[in-house]
């Protein structure tokens, strides 16, 4: 299997490495201009949210050594200067949050990369959501996007509902955990004034393209979904509230049955189902994209229903990055 490089060793970059180790994918190089190798060891070993790394991690002669395997470390600001080929890295995870267009992400090809997966939504790169539209991938695609964590939660659920009951239209709200772009105390935030308010003190209404992006991965839903976010003072795990008008009448029990069926069948490992009395911290470390909360949803009538689905917005998403790469590798071979 082709080897992986990670550009940007932040929350997602580090968790993609953890996910790769869990899934038997080989990461051979990491680039981050702001973190030296000793600091990488520390950040990878200790994680306030996901706990201490269970394996071994050390620095040795400029390499990051994880579970005895050497990972080449680069410290380049300009992606055109990263010599991926020297480390044998062909599939690059672009997790800086900076190079999110085809043009910008294509900078990695200069150093020998063959494919780039952007771990964020992209304005122009084809977007993929595991369990939803992977079959649309073709080996001639060089730069792709794994969409957002919220789209990865919403799209599998929306697909199941649309395939079985037809979504006429819908609105989504994500109650979203704090992320690194937010402020610890009030501070300037460009044009998004509310986003600059203290993350630990506030529920912050924010924009999200996650619902509209579903229309890119499920074309039949294009223009039928939109949504917004509330940023809340929790460190991890978010929850999608999808309220939809259905084309076909359905009881809530019928909807639950179809979601359960999908979670045990074609979407196993992507979509999960629970009837337990769960709260957000119960999903820290959950590797699914979306966990349907059967007890939290509520119908108004047989054509109008609110559906609830949880997601570990860090680790579930990072696992999908590796799943997407593995799928690409199987098709590119």
From Swiss-Prot:
Gene3D superfamilies: Dihydrodipicolinate Reductase, domain 2, NAD(P)-binding Rossmann-like Domain. Keywords: Cytoplasm, Glycolysis, NAD, Oxidoreductase. The record marks 176 as: Activates thiol group during catalysis. Coiled coil: none annotated. It is an enzyme of class 1 (oxidoreductase). GO terms for cellular component: cytoplasm; cytosol; microtubule cytoskeleton. One of its GO terms (biological process) is glycolytic process. This is Glyceraldehyde-3-phosphate dehydrogenase. Its EC number is 1.2.1.12. The active site is at residue 149. SUPFAM superfamilies: Glyceraldehyde-3-phosphate dehydrogenase-like, C-terminal domain, NAD(P)-binding Rossmann-fold domains. InterPro entries: GlycerAld/Erythrose_P_DH, GlycerAld_3-P_DH_AS, GlycerAld_3-P_DH_cat, GlycerAld_3-P_DH_NAD(P)-bd, Glyceraldehyde-3-P_DH_1, NAD(P)-bd_dom_sf. D-glyceraldehyde 3-phosphate binds at residues 148-150, 179, 208-209, 231. Pathway: Carbohydrate degradation; glycolysis; pyruvate from D-glyceraldehyde 3-phosphate: step 1/5. Pfam families: Gp_dh_C, Gp_dh_N. It catalyses: D-glyceraldehyde 3-phosphate + phosphate + NAD(+) = (2R)-3-phospho-glyceroyl phosphate + NADH + H(+). It is found in: Cytoplasm. GO terms for molecular function: glyceraldehyde-3-phosphate dehydrogenase (NAD+) (phosphorylating) activity; NAD binding; NADP binding. NAD(+) binds at residues 11-12, 32, 77, 313. Belongs to the glyceraldehyde-3-phosphate dehydrogenase family. Homotetramer.
């Amino acid at each position: 299997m082709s080897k992986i490089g990670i550009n940007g060793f932040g929350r997602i970059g580090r968790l993609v490495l953890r996910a790769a180790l869990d899934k038997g994918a080989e990461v051979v190089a990491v680039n981050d201009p702001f973190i030296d190798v000793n600091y990488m060891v520390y950040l990878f070993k200790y994680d306030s949210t996901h706990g201490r790394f269970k394996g071994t991690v050390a620095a040795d002669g400029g390499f990051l050594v994880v579970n005895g395997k050497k990972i080449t470390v680069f410290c380049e600001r300009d992606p055109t200067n990263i010599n991926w080929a020297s480390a044998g890295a062909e599939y690059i995870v672009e997790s800086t949050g900076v190079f999110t267009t085809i043009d910008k992400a294509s900078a990695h090809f200069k150093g020998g990369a063959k494919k780039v997966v952007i771990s964020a939504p992209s304005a122009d790169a084809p977007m993929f959501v595991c369990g939803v539209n992977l079959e649309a991938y073709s080996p001639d695609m060089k730069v792709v996007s794994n969409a957002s964590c919220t789209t990865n939660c919403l799209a599998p659920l929306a697909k199941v509902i649309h395939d079985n009951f037809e979504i006429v239209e819908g609105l989504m709200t994500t109650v979203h955990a704090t992320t690194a772009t937010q402020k610890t105390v009030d501070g300037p935030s460009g044009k998004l004034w509310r986003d600059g308010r203290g993350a630990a003190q506030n529920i912050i209404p924010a924009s999200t393209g996650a619902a509209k992006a579903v229309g890119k991965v499920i074309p039949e839903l294009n223009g039928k979904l939109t949504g917004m976010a509330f940023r809340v003072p929790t460190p991890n795990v978010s929850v999608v509230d999808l309220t939809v008008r259905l084309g076909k009448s359905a009881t809530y029990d019928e909807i639950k049955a179809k979601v359960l069926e999908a979670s045990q069948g074609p979407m196993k490992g992507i979509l999960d189902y629970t009837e337990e009395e769960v709260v957000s911290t119960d999903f820290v470390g959950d590797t699914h994209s979306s966990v349907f909360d059967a007890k939290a949803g509520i119908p108004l009538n047989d054509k109008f229903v609110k559906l609830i689905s949880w997601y570990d917005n860090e680790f579930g998403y990072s696992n999908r990055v590796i799943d997407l790469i593995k799928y690409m590798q199987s098709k590119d071979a």
